[in-house]
Regions:
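Cell-envelope/extracellular polymer assembly enzymes that use nucleotide-activated donors
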Residues: 2-4, 32, 170
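Short, well-formed alpha-helical segments that are part of the catalytic scaffolds
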Residues: 11-25
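A conserved acidic beta->alpha catalytic loop
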Residues: 22, 29, 37-45, 86
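Glycine-rich, basic loop-to-helix element that forms the pyrophosphate-binding segment
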Residues: 58-74
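Short aromatic/hydrophobic "clamp" motif used to bind/position activated sugar donors
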Residues: 79
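Conserved donor NDP-sugar-binding/catalytic core segment of glycosyltransferases
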Residues: 91-118
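A recurrent flexible, glycine/aromatic-enriched loop bordering the glycosyltransferase active site
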Residues: 112-117, 130-148
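Acidic donor-binding loop at a coil-to-helix junction in glycosyltransferase catalytic cores
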Residues: 165-171
Length: 226
């Protein structure tokens, strides 16, 4: 098995079908798709199975635990991760795999969907500028919705740390000590604007807190409120 895709999911029966359909349209099909059912109380597991995904159950509530469970269950040499409310563009995996030579991890940009065209453009270009800056500073900013890494390398550094947020970024920092972590600008993933439910200012303040190491929890409302 060359490539596994892992999706952590807590009560995602509504969003998950669109994510799995987006993966089915990939120009570079993954060898397996794993949905980690993270203490769901809805039909997340049944939805995943209906789409042919392999379901892994993680009873310990928290996205870091779910990602770690997916990493351990994956059979692929490479493991890509996205979120259950995200829509990888059709060439997402193809773009990442094309740039993998010599790298231990790769990541790409995000754009919100479900917002106005202006807000979508703002989210994408603002995030791209941030990623370019971090890449220049050699501070890779892996995002759980758009990342891929060598499974062996991730296991070597212990996988995802047990934190409430930034588990993806912290894994990226650890992987960067082993080898190149590469930014791939054309490997785009669309992600749900439900993260903006409280508005742009609270969202940006939360991201700043996360960046400064004072993360907010993901399960504040019983769901994954990243």
């Amino acid at each position: 098995v060359r490539l596994s895709v892992v999706i952590p999911a807590h009560n995602e029966e509504t969003y998950l079908p669109s994510t799995l359909k987006a993966l089915a349209r990939q120009t570079f099909p993954p060898d397996e798709v794993i949905v980690v059912d993270n203490a769901s109380t809805d039909r997340t597991a049944q939805v995943a199975e209906a789409f042919g995904a392999r379901v892994v159950h993680c009873g310990r509530k928290g996205v870091a635990f779910a990602r770690q469970a997916g990493l351990l269950a994956a059979r692929g040499e490479w493991v890509a991760m996205t979120d259950a409310d995200s829509l990888p563009t059709p060439t997402w995996l193809e773009r990442l795999m094309a740039r993998r030579e010599g790298a231990v991890a790769l990541y790409g940009p995000l754009r919100f969907y479900g917002v106005s065209p202006l807000e979508a453009a703002f989210s994408e270009w603002g995030y791209r500028a941030f990623l370019h800056l971090m890449a220049l500073l050699r501070r890779p900013n892996l995002a759980g919705a758009n990342m891929m890494f060598l499974r062996e390398a991730a296991l070597r550094v212990g996988g995802f740390p047990e934190v409430e947020a930034r588990e993806d970024v912290l894994l990226g920092y650890a992987l960067a000590r082993l080898g190149p972590v590469r930014y791939v600008p054309d490997a785009l993933v669309l992600t749900s604007a439900r993260r903006l439910k409280r508005g742009w200012v609270p969202f940006l303040l939360q991201q700043l807190k996360n960046l400064l190491g004072r993360p907010e929890g993901y399960f504040e409302d019983g769901g994954r409120g990243r």
